[in-house]
Amino acid sequence: MLQTTLLALQGLSCMNCAQRVKAALESREDVHHAEVNVHYAKVTGEADTHALIETIKQTGYQATEAQTPDVELHLSGLSCGHCTETVRKALEAVSGVISADVTLESANVYGKADIQTLIAAVEQAGYHATQQGIDSPKTEPLTHSAQSQPESLAAAPNTVPATNVALATSTVSDTNTVLPTNTALPTNTTSTTSTADTASATSTAPVINPLPVTESVAQPAASEGESVQLLLTGMSCASCVSKVQNALQRVDGVQVARVNLAERSALVTGTQNNEALIAAVKNAGYGAEIIEDEGERRERQQQMSQASMKRFQWQAALGLLLGIPLMAWGLFGGSMTLTPETQTPWLIIGIITLLVMIFAGGHFYRNAWVSLKNGRATMDTLVALGTGAAWIYSITVNIWPDVFPMEARHLYYEASAMIIGLINLGHAMEQRARQRSSNALERLLDLAPPTAKLVTDDGEKVIPLADVQLGMILRLTTGDRVPVDGEIVQGEVWMDEAMLTGEPIPQQKSVGDIVHAGTQVQDGTVQFRASAIGSQTTLARIIKLVRQAQSSKPEIGKLADRISAVFVPTVVVIAIVAGLIWYFFGPQPQLVYTLVVATTVLIIACPCALGLATPMSIISGVGRAAEFGVLVRDADALQQASNLDTLVFDKTGTLTEGHPQVVAIHTFNGVSEQQALGWAAALETGSNHPLARAILQRAEGLTLATASQFRTLRGLGVSGEVDGIPLLLGNNRLLEEQQIDTRELQSLIQQQAESGATPVILTANGKPAALLSIRDPLREDSIGALQRLHQLGYSLVMLTGDNPITANAIAKEAGIDRVIAGVLPDGKADAIKQLQAAGHKVAMIGDGINDAPALAQADVGIAMGGGSDIAIETAAITLMRHSLYGVVDAVELSKATLRNMKQNLLGAFFYNALGIPIAAGILYPFTGTLLSPVVAGAAMALSSITVVSNANRLLRFKPKQ
């Protein structure tokens, strides 16, 4: 029974000692894997503890079973087995840790690691940890409910007021849909408390100010498990894919197994044992290995790919070296029919052909034999049967010619050699094309530099990327690529984030800003603190997401798989039936015609093209999308996105900038704009309210006076004195209660409200001094992107919790067709359902937090996120750059990918539907000739090359401007 044993080691002084112990342990047949450092050995296998200790003693060291952990942590926030597994992996990823035993409440850590680094690793995984016996302050959880309370716009310093959402009862156009207020409001609704509560003069109801909606970081469900990638060998066609996938799916703990023929890999998700996965693949007749380290796995995959290509090249050369001269001999007048004079030369050629078949085509026969033992048929079965039948017939004629009539003594040695040569040549060209299709993922992998510059007390030190730990201070200078995610603690830089987000314009970063692994410094120098390393970085998550998507299948691909599963047995039956028809009803010599027809049918059928049609398009399409900053979680999203007719947009943060700005200042009674802005900012100093921040942001650079006699006027605004001048700042009702004449302002107030802005009024000495127009403006590229989507034929809808007047104004400016306003997050999913019930194929575009229910309900969810956990985990498609042109790229690329997929599938089906009947001799009554097995072999190789080459066209895809 497979078990893991942890041993404490004594006497080791360096990693050479550790390697010696590791080699000794792994030399045992009952040890599958050993992980060793100078303190511990973690051994997986069937060996008992005593035997392992004796093995270590033989190397000159001592060992005992590890029982006392080096660090004990108290855990909180864990609720299931998936949580404990996540924390265990996070702890064991810390440098120096060899093993961690994790329960729902505690973790025993074995290894030499800093306690704070261990705690940080747990926090990074989304849970909480403190050292056993120490009551440390509990950090903020990643998943939380925002319990903000309503607050004045001019709140006291260090308070965070609630966000206000105005739901006015104004009449809107017929294109708007206003959901009833009583279905949209939470139960803890309170009255307005700040200047944000300004409503238009036409409003007849008090403005409602709901509390913020609960925000949460999307955590993977416990049932999702962890993903592991296997590198596979021996697969040749879609039948192999089906066999391996079924074998993996039957392993205990496996939830999802995705096998990729193009990449020769499998992505398995679940709680399975890795050794069991490898055993399952081997029992199915194929090879498999698991390499955890990304760099090592990539190197191994490249080595396997290069080795395969070289092997196919020399095998093709060997087959063609014999086949081409033989074929040329026959084409240019030489006799391919055996005579008594040529029996010996042809026998020598037959033996040479056999050697070529063994050395250049041995893999076909070995794989076919393994397939037969496992009760299945693959492409190798077809090749083995076809070439084997041709050679056996020829050698039989060669040895016993008298058994056959003269007209049946034609030899087909050249067919066996040429078929093997051509198919190997096709495999070599296909391998080269597949390498090109993986370039997008390779470029992502290349973004992470191999080293990092560590800042120490003794100066700067270059360390390997694998040695970077959480909390380390690292330095970046011009031209450097960022090794890990982190927060800038000193300096300022311009960052090129194009490869990560698709955004071509350099971004300025300074203290407090986050830098992401893989981005590049264009100018400047900074120091930053590592906050995410290894598989936790944004880049690593993107790579994982791309790999998962490339291994997934859309519905159209699953249809191809179902056909492929029965394809080869069907072809064998067709070959037998066709051969029998020619044997019993064909012209003389029937035996020759039977052999030619059966062999040609077997050779021309190409399940390989069918198996590659979908995965090659997916690999190219998903990879190209990643280069545009469009992350696809599942290939089925591409198929769904290609069928959309309606795009639904959230307003705040999607169509708009996401934060209010002062867009205009109107002054009265001789007050200057600068003076009015200074007074308003003085009253708002210390407030964190979004509208207060907008005023303070507009006043940056001004010298502000100190406000005195400050008062918060609930639901109205604020008052105070600046330089002895009494000031009021708030909504229209504030001025009415203070009996200040606002008749001259009413038309302007109405105009601002209708344009979607919030009018905030400032008075000085009892007279209007200024009206500040505050609104959340459209993003610079929103109008252009929406126009492009209109040109592509999409219906555009805005779905927002904002009031209808503001929503309608923004929609009119943006060019939105329809507005659904006054909807809180829990009602957005229902709005999507209504659109779907009307027969629309709907995509929801939102920020991935409050829009989560709608993103899940939509046919395709598209999250606008800068690579955050929330955005990546919520939607089927994530846009890494905050631009609506990413939506344009996503829908155009999805259409191009599905079109390419259909072309490949149609080509593969058409090729087989046309080729097999021709090979069976359907044209013989009209032409008097049969298709040569050699031509069939060339056609088979060409069909696979065509599919791969067509898929690679996606790598050059560019969205239309």
Curated annotation (Swiss-Prot):
It comes from the Bacteria. The keyword Aminoacyl-tRNA synthetase does not apply. It is a multi-pass membrane protein. The keyword Nucleotidyltransferase does not apply. It catalyses: Cu(+)(in) + ATP + H2O = Cu(+)(out) + ADP + phosphate + H(+). Keywords: ATP-binding, Cell membrane, Copper, Copper transport, Ion transport, Magnesium, Membrane, Metal-binding, Nucleotide-binding, Phosphoprotein, Repeat, Translocase, Transmembrane, Transmembrane helix, Transport. Cu(+) 1 binds at C14, C17. CDD domains: HMA, P-type_ATPase_Cu-like. GO terms for biological process: copper ion homeostasis. Residues 142-151 have a biased composition (Polar residues). Cu(+) 2 binds at C80, C83. Residues 3-64, 69-130, 226-289 form the HMA domain. The active site is at D650 (4-aspartylphosphate intermediate). Its EC number is 7.2.2.8. Gene3D superfamilies: 3.30.70.100, Calcium-transporting ATPase, cytoplasmic domain N (3.40.1110.10), Calcium-transporting ATPase, cytoplasmic transduction domain A (2.70.150.10), HAD superfamily/HAD-like (3.40.50.1000). Residues 131-153, 178-201 are annotated as: Disordered. It is found in: Cell membrane. Its main location: membrane. Mg(2+) binds at D847, D851. InterPro entries: ATPase_P-typ_cyto_dom_N (IPR023299), ATPase_P-typ_P_site (IPR018303), ATPase_P-typ_TM_dom_sf (IPR023298), ATPase_P-typ_transduc_dom_A_sf (IPR008250), HAD-like_sf (IPR036412), HAD_sf (IPR023214), Heavy-metal-associated_CS (IPR017969), HMA_dom (IPR006121). The chain crosses the membrane at residues 316-336, 345-365, 381-401, 565-585, 592-612, 860-880, 906-926, 928-948. Belongs to the cation transport ATPase (P-type) (TC 3.A.3) family. Type IB subfamily. Involved in copper export. This is Copper-exporting P-type ATPase. It comes from Yersinia pestis.
